[in-house]
Amino acid sequence: MTGWWASITLSSGDPMARPEAKATQMVDDAKVRVTRFDFAPGAETGWHTHGMDYVITPVTDCEMLLEEPGGATRRVTIPAGESYRRDAGVEHNVINDGDAPMSFVEVELK
């Protein structure tokens, strides 16, 4: 992946075992990069490390399985519209762990 993924470093060159989430860049300027992610059930982002602080706002209710370094996993459910913020440096793979499509908008702070 290239272009808007410039701030995200994929952790492995291995092909993903699951379908890939669809990423649609909405804004990319000097201050922010805004990307919408749409996941079919079971789809994933692939392992990556965030190069910038970011805010996530779910468009739908999101049932996520987060794969983390060292083999740890976390299941989280985030209601539509409930935003959260993370610092740069987060490494993970985000998977739609639900039975329905899920979507969120990511705002990266430059």
Please report, for each region that a protein language model flagged, where it lies by residue.
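A short glycine-rich, His/Asp/Glu-containing loop-to-beta-strand
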Residues: P19-W47, D53-I56, V107
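Glycine- and acidic-residue-biased ligand/ion/polar-headgroup-sensing regions
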Residues: H50-G70
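Short beta-strand His + acidic residue motifs that chelate non-heme Fe in jelly-roll/DSBH
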Residues: T45-W47, L65-L66, E91-G98
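Short acidic-glycine-tyrosine-enriched beta hairpin
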Residues: A72-A88
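Ligand-binding loop in jelly-roll beta-barrel domains
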Residues: G89-K110
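Tryptophan (W) side chains
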Residues: W4-W5
